[in-house]
Curated annotation (Swiss-Prot):
Keywords from the named record: Activation of host autophagy by virus, Calcium, Enterotoxin, Glycoprotein, Host endoplasmic reticulum, Host membrane, Host-virus interaction, Ion channel, Ion transport, Membrane, Metal-binding, Secreted, Signal-anchor, Toxin, Transmembrane, Transmembrane helix, Transport, Viral ion channel, Virulence
Family: Belongs to the rotavirus NSP4 family.
Organism in which the protein naturally occurs: Rotavirus A (strain RVA/Cow/United States/WC3/1981/G6P7[5]) (RV-A)
Biological function: Plays an essential role in the virus replication cycle by acting as a viroporin. Creates a pore in the host endoplasmic reticulum and as a consequence releases Ca(2+) in the cytoplasm of infected cell. In turn, high levels of cytoplasmic calcium trigger membrane trafficking and transport of viral ER-associated proteins to viroplasms, sites of viral genome replication and immature particle assembly.
A GO cellular-component term linked to this record: host cell rough endoplasmic reticulum membrane
PTM comment, free text: The N-glycosyl content is primarily Man(9)GlcNAc, with a small amount of Man(8)GlcNAc.
Name the record gives this protein: Non-structural glycoprotein 4
Lineage of the species this protein comes from: Viruses, Riboviria, Orthornavirae, Duplornaviricota, Resentoviricetes
Length: 175
């Protein structure tokens, strides 16, 4: 903790990096190296300065770590979008939310599949029972007179006086 907050330590590391970089720079083939080195120096300084500042800010402001992490992730995502990247940084909380959502959807799908399979099994059993009932009866045992309502039908010889009772009769009405 002392090394993280010690400004002298940070300055000595920066001085060491700069002296190392200047010795490397004497080579004429390293034209773009100073730009890379300056970016690395700035990043290292930001890293060393942000950790103690973040710890002090968390203790004094009493805001949660998740809020600060969310703010930092949002800032980095905005910077990535400005730079033209389509990728985004996600936190563990977002990943856990997404996995929970996927697991919930998978459970719902499994319940749906279970319901559908039980319905299909019931339908197959019903079809089997219908098939068994159809296969048990022989065709010549079925009395078709019940099916076409011909049980009480009389033939021409059985009609009274030989007249067809279904023929229309003349009806006269008084006016």
């Amino acid at each position: 903790m002392d090394k993280l907050t010690d400004l002298n330590y940070t300055l000595s590391v920066i001085t060491l990096m700069n002296s190392t970089l200047h010795t490397i720079l004497e080579d004429p083939g390293m034209a773009y190296f100073p730009y890379i080195a300056s970016v690395l120096t700035v990043l290292f300084t930001l890293h060393k300065a942000s950790i103690p500042t973040m710890k002090i800010a968390l203790k004094t402001s009493k805001c949660s770590y998740k809020v600060v992490k969310y703010c930092i992730v949002t800032i980095f995502n905005a910077l990535l979008k400005l730079a033209g990247y389509k990728e985004q940084i996600t936190t563990k909380d977002e990943i856990e939310k997404q996995t929970d959502r996927v697991v919930k959807e998978m459970r719902r799908q499994l319940e749906m599949i279970d319901k559908l399979t039980t319905r299909e099994i019931e339908q197959v059993e019903l079809l089997k029972r219908i098939h068994d009932k159809l296969m048990i009866r022989a065709v010549d045992e079925i009395d078709m007179t019940k099916e076409i309502n011909q049980k009480n039908v009389k033939t021409l010889e059985e009609w009274e006086n030989g007249k067809n009772p279904y023929e229309p009769k003349e009806v006269t009405a008084a006016m």
